[in-house]
Amino acid sequence: MGQKINPLGFRLGTTQSHHSLWFAQPKNYSEGLQEDQKIQDCIRNYVQKNMRISSGVEGIARIEIQKRIDLIQVIIYMGFPKLLIEGRSRGIEELQSSVQKRFNSVNRKLNIAITRIAKPYGHPNILAEFIAGQLKNRVSFRKAIKKAIELTEQADTKGIQVQIAGRIDGKEIARVEWIREGRVPLQTIRAKIDYCSYTVRTIYGALGIKIWIFTDEE
């Protein structure tokens, strides 16, 4: 059988870049990793709690972290920043202070910026959240995937592959179903492919969603 490598790690340095940029002594490296994880979890929890409408889509495509000696710069790429910011001018400041409270670094300043993504449904994370929301509402999985593929086609992508595994539609036996639309050249390193795996908890059990989106070729 073909061995599946993670498409993001496979393309690091060519079409993909690291989401965290910092240097540390080997003995402090694990602390830095845990700090990154805490920052990401804290941001996601805050966004979940403070969404303006309960759309079920957080709309976070990715979180980039850059650390210097005296500053931690966090950039949140969101598809729908209005949900968080609209009507709350102090939304970012609140988020900043709640993250700062979580990890007590006195001598480092934390700076959070939110960047809007032009075509949110061209990003697998946002699309996975959309499909997860549909599956939780007991929409049939084929309908959910078809709707998701329609949304990505509007975002000018060249190809998409969606895979769902688990007790689909509450069936007794777990199975894997996948649908591909357009081209998804996983072996071509210069092909810019975005990937995400997402777990959704339904009343029948956990379902795994994997999405590959082929956006461009360099």
From Swiss-Prot:
- Per the annotation, which location comes first and is thus the protein's main one? plastid
Please state every residue range assigned to the domain named KH type-2: 43-118
- List the GO molecular function terms: rRNA binding; structural constituent of ribosome
GO cellular component terms, A-Z = chloroplast; cytosolic small ribosomal subunit
Give the superkingdom in one word: Eukaryota
User: Which terms are listed as keywords in the entry?
Assistant: Chloroplast, Plastid, Ribonucleoprotein, Ribosomal protein, RNA-binding, rRNA-binding
**Oligomer and partners:** Part of the 30S ribosomal subunit.
Q: Which NCBIfam families match?
A: rpsC_bact
Identification of the protein by name: Small ribosomal subunit protein uS3c
**Source organism of the structure:** Nandina domestica (Heavenly bamboo)
